[in-house]
From Swiss-Prot:
It is a multi-pass membrane protein. Pfam families: PTS_EIIA_1, PTS_EIIB, PTS_EIIC. The keyword Transport applies. It comes from Staphylococcus saprophyticus subsp. saprophyticus (strain ATCC 15305 / DSM 20229 / NCIMB 8711 / NCTC 7292 / S-41). The chain crosses the membrane at residues 16-36, 63-83, 89-109, 126-146, 170-190, 211-231, 273-293, 303-323, 329-349, 355-375, 382-402. The active site is at residues 447, 599. This is PTS system glucose-specific EIICBA component. Its main location: membrane.
Length: 678
């Protein structure tokens, strides 16, 4: 029961991220537009007082403001998409339902343009419809209902004479009906709910605001590992608290009030549930990253410097803290608990200093400048001394606790030597052991690049052991582990499956003498190998491939290729070494011994071969320009995250990769030179 509820809450939390992701763009427009109209910036840049520039500034402010004015509708559509696996039909259904519910509530309650502006009534004009104000909560309810209608009716069958309305077309019809019915209980009970929310928020904020902001920061931080923080902070940002703007409209929610006050140039009173992030994200966590680097083992410091440096810069600039927090969360929970306490105290300190700062994305430097420094409506400079003090506290507390309790933070892990000499026959047994054993495996799968395992308890997984076994990287997404073993991943998965079924047993240990050692054949490498485009399309840097396994070169170096049509051809003369059963990837070896992986699309293993037609088989001889595969590009575009096709050289070794300065290419056009200087 609890696990099911927890899973549902996680899904809702993730669904909220889509509408929230729109806010930074809106905030950027609004903040820059407002700053350009403000006296502070005009004092330093008098030329922006030009009439044309001011007109642009007004348009930017209006463009950003319209997003915040219609947040409930955006949340309705965003939540629907998030809970319906990204299908746009759910968003259309949510839009239809939102209109129907508001129009019906307005008619039922006799709301008119004459009484809609009476703030005490709880009415509002929504998309020009005089109705009951349900705010973001109303949008979330409609979004969840639209997702339910989609998941329930998207594949419904109807009699042949009604066949046009079958399937997904039936979803908006059902949504219009259900939202019409929903409008009546909403009109009846929502005023009481809104009154209760207002009373709760007023009591929370007026009775002991300091305690409230501390607990908000503390609890929100503790919920991050569970992915529930989005659900927790949504009421505070979008519903709790009330403020009447110049037009007489009642604005609810700390973030919405803050943005409205920035837009109007009013005195700032909001930001209590956002401002505490700035000292932590801009100063505290980067200092914690420095402590982790300084406590790493000397031989690991170079690697840790890159890891922690990137995470610290991300936290400082954007306020995205997960890469840094998850580096110590599981190995040192005490550090995370201390971090949560310090986060709560940061909210309390800035509240006591009467600072009012907010953001549209997170508490990083970008939002700090746009919504704090440029508007110049609060004592934004106080964040700096508070942040400097926080940097010292984070650094010395983290350093002391890491050394005192010998936490295995990045760079301090124990080496796992017991698996490094695994033979091919022992490897699946050892990988299974590193995954926590057979009893810890919930679901087992693989693609041509990685082993995908859903485990019951992530704490039982030996990540260092997996790397020692040959995994070039291990990704953790919830309880889903992805171990990057390259092309042998599918074989490991196959063998692990047989082991779990009891069909194969661990081989006996044998002693190998020197006389039995294998003969090593040395192949002379060519000084230069050319790789040509595998079709018509575009070439992009590997770093832009939307999959960090490829983008971070865990599989090898290369480029990304975006096919323009469905024909995939051989990029050189050579041999087909591997074709994955689902046909989404093919491994080739050139006549000069260079190994190339062509991975068509991202996460296309889940398509189970649908949309792929192969014209070659393993061990076939191929020539440059020969058709290897025909793909249904429309199908892949609709059912996979991306059609970007990584071209990965898996045995580059000490050779140099030279990518041609090209973008739009045709089949058989030179795109890569691999040069051997030896």
């Amino acid at each position: 029961m609890f696990k099911k509820l927890f899973g549902q809450l996680q899904r809702i939390g993730k669904a909220l991220m889509l509408p929230v992701a729109i806010l930074p763009a809106a905030g950027l427009l609004l903040a820059i537009g407002t700053a350009m109209q403000g006296e502070s910036l005009q004092h330093y840049l008098p030329f922006i007082q030009n009439g044309g520039i001011q007109s642009v500034a007004e348009m930017m402010t209006g463009a950003g403001g319209i997003i915040f004015d219609n947040l409930p509708m955006i949340f309705a559509m965003g939540v629907a998409i998030g809970l319906a696996s990204g299908d746009g039909v759910a968003a259309i259904a949510a839009f239809v339902g939102y209109l129907v519910m508001n129009k019906t509530m307005g008619a039922f309650l006799h709301v008119s343009p004459d009484n809609v502006n009476d703030a005490a009534s709880g009415y509002a004009s929504v998309l020009g419809i005089p109705t009951l104000q349900t705010g973001v909560f109303g949008g979330i309810i409609i979004g969840a209902l639209a997702a339910w209608c989609y998941n329930k009716f998207y594949n419904i069958s109807l009699p042949s004479y009604l066949g046009f309305f079958a399937g997904k077309r039936f979803v908006p019809i059902m949504m219009a009906t259900t939202s019409f019915i929903l409008a009546f209980p909403m009109a009846w009970i929502w005023p009481s709910i809104q009154t209760g929310l207002n009373a709760f928020s007023e009591g929370l904020l007026d009775s002991n605001t300091g305690l409230a902001v501390f607990l908000f920061g503390f609890i929100k931080r503790l919920l991050i590992p569970f992915g529930l923080h989005h659900i927790f902070h949504a009421p505070f940002w979008f519903e709790f608290g009330a403020w009447k703007n110049a037009a007489g409209e009642m604005i609810h929610g700390d973030q919405r009030i803050f943005i409205e006050q920035i837009r109007e140039g009013s005195k700032l009173t909001a930001g209590k549930f956002m401002q505490g992030e700035f000292p932590v994200m801009m100063f505290g966590l980067p200092a914690a990253a420095l402590a982790i680097y300084h406590t790493a083992k000397p031989e690991n410091k170079k690697v840790v410097a890159g890891l922690m440096g990137s995470a610290a810069l991300t936290s400082f600039l954007t306020g995205i803290t997960e890469p840094l927090e998850f580096s110590f969360l599981f190995v040192a929970p005490v550090l995370f608990f201390v971090h949560a306490i310090l986060d709560g105290l940061s909210f309390l300190i800035l509240y006591l200093l009467n600072v009012h700062l907010g953001y549209t994305f997170s508490g990083g430097f970008i939002d700090y400048v746009l919504l704090g420094v440029l508007p110049n409506k609060t004592q934004w400079w106080l964040v700096i001394p508070v942040g400097v003090v926080y940097a010292f506290i984070y650094y010395f507390v983290f350093r002391f606790l890491i050394l005192k309790f010998k936490y295995k933070t990045p760079g301090r892990e124990d080496k796992q030597a017991q698996f490094t000499n695994s033979s091919a026959s022992e490897l699946p047994f050892n990988v299974l052991k590193a995954m926590g054993g057979e009893e810890n495996i919930k679901h087992l799968d693989a693609c041509i690049t990685r082993l995908r395992v859903e485990v019951k308890e992530k704490g039982k997984v030996d990540v260092a052991g997996l790397k020692a076994l040959g995994a070039s990287g291990v990704l953790e997404v919830g309880n889903n582990m992805q171990a990057i073993f390259g092309p042998k991943s599918d074989q490991i998965k196959h063998d692990m499956s047989l082991i779990m079924k009891g069909e194969i047993t661990k081989p006996q240990e044998t002693t190998v003498t020197e006389e039995e050692s294998e003969e090593v054949v040395h192949i002379e490498r060519a000084s230069e190998v050319n790789i040509y485009a595998p079709g018509n399309g575009q070439v992009i840097p590997l770093s832009e491939v939307p999959d960090q396994v490829f983008a971070q070169k865990m599989m090898g170096d290369g480029v990304g290729f975006i096919p323009a049509d469905g024909k995939i051809v051989a990029p050189f003369d050579g041999t087909v070494k591997t074709i994955f059963p689902t046909k989404h990837a093919i491994g080739l070896e050139s006549d000069q011994g260079l190994e190339l992986l062509i991975h068509i699309g991202i996460d296309t293993v889940k398509l189970n071969g649908e949309g792929f037609e192969s014209f070659v088989e393993t061990d076939d001889r191929v020539h440059k320009g020969q058709v290897l595969m025909q793909i249904d590009l429309d199908y892949i575009t609709a059912h996979a995250p991306s059609t970007v096709t990584p071209l990965i050289i898996t045995n580059l070794e000490d050779r140099q990769l030279s990518v041609e300065d090209v973008k739009d290419v045709t089949a058989e056009q030179l795109i890569i030179k691999v040069i051997d200087d030896k």
